[in-house]
């Protein structure tokens, strides 16, 4: 496990299953319709129970680069922040991923929450390269934590060893 300090906040790397983390919020790599399908979203749907998808349906969707918050249902995390990352090839992907990351952190602050875990957004079926993902997301988090925030801890939770190693090289 690797950790760095930015101002008054910690950024940590963890390898494992994001749905097993006991935090204020975990981030779901969502689609713009907020339908919990496969990947991280599927794991959240299976372990969190139907209430999360029901809340997503009530919200109705959000834009690429946007984020919305729901309850954590039966998960260990209190909330799920559904961040919509870009699909590779749609254009302006780096900025959209940065926005999804920043909008997730803003929601955390707005709800006076202190801890959050991100997966590698858009690197699954959306086809975004893991090395670019690590650069964009880590820089966005560092930039946000350098400002005025109450966030105490940001975790990047990577499912595979290879993804963890890519983020490990980038986090310095």
Protein language model features and the residues they cover:
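Glycine-/small-residue-enriched capping loops at alpha/beta junctions
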Residues: 1-111
